[in-house]
């Protein structure tokens, strides 16, 4: 699509990835998508990042277990790490997390889910997801 628009003289100044994903989202697909965007030479922005432990499934009994917390942390780390590995520094526009705290997530009220998709809990305390994200940025 980018090439098609550019050939028609339509200016494109950058590309964004909305990433409202679950903990089971395919890592190979995510990495491949980032490489494809980077191959355009345009700035790449992860414009909306939140990672659902429910994987978009309605489960009123879902518990934010240690296992789910770790999976979420691992996915946040992977996203930050693959962004840095796949997108050259001059093309990195940034990563925007779509909210700060689980207290204000748009996911639960809009989709009727029980989830904890953000790096801070409802009391604005850091979660494992925060640590994973930070570790991914450091690598």
Feature annotation, model-predicted:
Residues 19-20:
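His-enriched metal-coordination microenvironments in redox/metal-binding proteins
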Residues 15:
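Active-site-adjacent helix-turn-beta-strand microarchitecture at beta-sheet edges
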Residues 23:
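Acidic, metal-coordinating catalytic cores used for nucleic-acid/nucleotide bond scission
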Residues 29-45, 49-139:
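Aromatic-rich peripheral "rim/lid" segments of glycoside hydrolase catalytic domains that contact
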Residues 7-11, 87-90:
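Short helix-capping segments at alpha-helix termini
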Residues 1-8, 26-34:
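Distinct, well-ordered alpha-helical segments
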């Amino acid at each position: 699509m980018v090439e098609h628009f550019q050939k028609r003289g339509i200016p494109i100044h950058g590309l964004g990835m909305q990433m409202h994903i679950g903990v089971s989202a395919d890592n190979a697909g995510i990495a491949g998508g980032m490489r494809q965007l980077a191959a355009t030479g345009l700035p790449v922005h992860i414009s909306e990042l939140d990672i659902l432990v429910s994987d978009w499934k309605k489960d009123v009994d879902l518990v934010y277990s240690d296992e789910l917390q770790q999976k979420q942390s691992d996915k946040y780390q992977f996203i930050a790490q693959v962004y840095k590995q796949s997108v050259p520094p001059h093309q990195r526009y940034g990563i925007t997390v779509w909210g700060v705290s689980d207290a204000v997530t748009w996911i639960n009220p809009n989709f009727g889910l029980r989830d904890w998709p953000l790096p801070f809990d409802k009391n604005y305390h850091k979660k494992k997801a925060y640590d994973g994200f930070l570790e991914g940025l450091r690598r």
